[in-house]
């Protein structure tokens, strides 16, 4: 049986903390990150605030600017590689 699913809120909170920590590691302000990502500062604030589910295109742009990849993981813990079915 698969482990219990984390709540969506937990996922968004973890994403917010991870992105904020990475931005701090790089010594960037939210405004600088937004400029690098080609998004508005409000997008960075929304992602880091973790209050709502952010738009995927904004998340992808910010992840790319942070030098990060987003990874899809099944509930069983397997990583799904691009192009896999």
Give residue spans per PLM region.
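Residue-level recognition of specific faces of alpha-helices
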Residues: 11, 18, 32, 43-46, ...
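Short, charged recognition helix plus adjacent turn
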Residues: 2, 72-85
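Short basic helix-loop element that most often maps to the first helix and adjoining turn
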Residues: 17-35, 61
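A short, Lys/Arg-rich alpha-helix, primarily the initiator
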Residues: 2-25
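DNA major-groove recognition helix of helix-turn-helix/homeodomain DNA-binding modules
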Residues: 57-73
């Amino acid at each position: 049986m698969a482990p219990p699913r984390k709540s969506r809120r937990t996922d968004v909170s973890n994403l917010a903390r991870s992105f904020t920590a990475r931005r701090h590691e790089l010594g960037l302000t939210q405004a600088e990150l937004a400029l690098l990502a080609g998004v508005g500062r409000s997008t960075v604030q929304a992602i880091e605030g973790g209050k709502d589910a952010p738009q995927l295109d904004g998340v992808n742009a910010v992840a790319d600017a942070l030098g990060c990849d987003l990874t899809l993981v099944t509930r069983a813990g397997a990583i799904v590689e691009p192009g896999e079915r």
